[in-house]
Amino acid sequence: VTSVEPPEHVRATFGLREVTPVSLGDWEGGWRFGDVVLSPVADHARAAWSAKTRETLKVDGLRLARPVRATDGRYVVSGWRADTYLEGAPEPRHDEVVSVSLRLHQATANLERPRFLAQPPVMPWVDVDVFVAADRAAWEPVPLRTLRAGGAALSTSPDGRRSLELIGQLATLRKPVQTPPQLVHGDLFGTVLFAGAHTPGLTDITPYWRPVPWAAGVIVVDALSWGGADDGLLDRWADLPEWPQMLLRAVMFRLAVHALHPRSTPQAFPGLARTADMVRLTL
């Protein structure tokens, strides 16, 4: 996330030379130019994929930010993307966010798997590699084996070490799942925008190739760990396929992010550990 204004040539390429920018701190470090938002992108391939997908995707009961192409047709220019501005802000309406995820994933069910989702994380890591590695850790037979083999730096902080211990314990509780993977948005907590009674909005799609109930599980794990959700949230979605096993992999994923991410804070761990205990009780 950056607060640096988009450079003049980027603004010009998106046709935004005449408009005064307004900083939108919480919109992924974006800048608003009238009806258009310029945001810095963390990963070019993912940003271009998200833009292309959002250009035509239609989802019942969801407003999607549409990409604004540069004058030469590009989605990403010098590390910036442009989208239509959506009114709204994240709110702790956790059940509604899970509902949004189910509607979104009906619409993404027929999308092909992008090539970049099959690529392993590469050293030296950037932000996106941390999430790829953490995602793999939750599903591979021996969590984090590939990372250790690749010489990745695993956390040495007390909470980081505790995260790694928990991942090892939780891994033994996994059973094979049958729900097929598809294209899902793996980071919906805190990214769905609400504006009163208006239709919820979404500005980006963070792609993973996993089962739909796993993506719902990540929302629930995040909401319980950091969003002040009531404990009943866990049970209200128990009808989703293979729910306990999906929650298990979702909490392993978040624990792995905690252990691997350089900006993890000790304060984030207690909520996550408590959620891991709750998930254990569902198995």
List the predicted regions and their residue ranges:
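A cross-family kinase active-site recognition segment
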Residues: E91-P158
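Juxta-kinase regulatory segment immediately upstream of eukaryotic protein kinase catalytic domains
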Residues: V1-E18
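Active-site Asp-x-Gly
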Residues: A195-W243
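ATP-binding pocket architecture of kinase catalytic cores
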Residues: P21, D26-R115
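ATP/Mg2+ or Mg2+-diphosphate-binding catalytic cores
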Residues: V257-L283
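Short, conserved active-site entrance elements at the starts or edges of catalytic domains
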Residues: T2-E5, R148-P181
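A structured, mid-to-C-terminal "fold-capping" secondary-structure block
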Residues: G232-L260
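Active-site acidic catalytic loop and adjacent metal/ATP-binding pocket
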Residues: D26-S39, P67, G168-V212
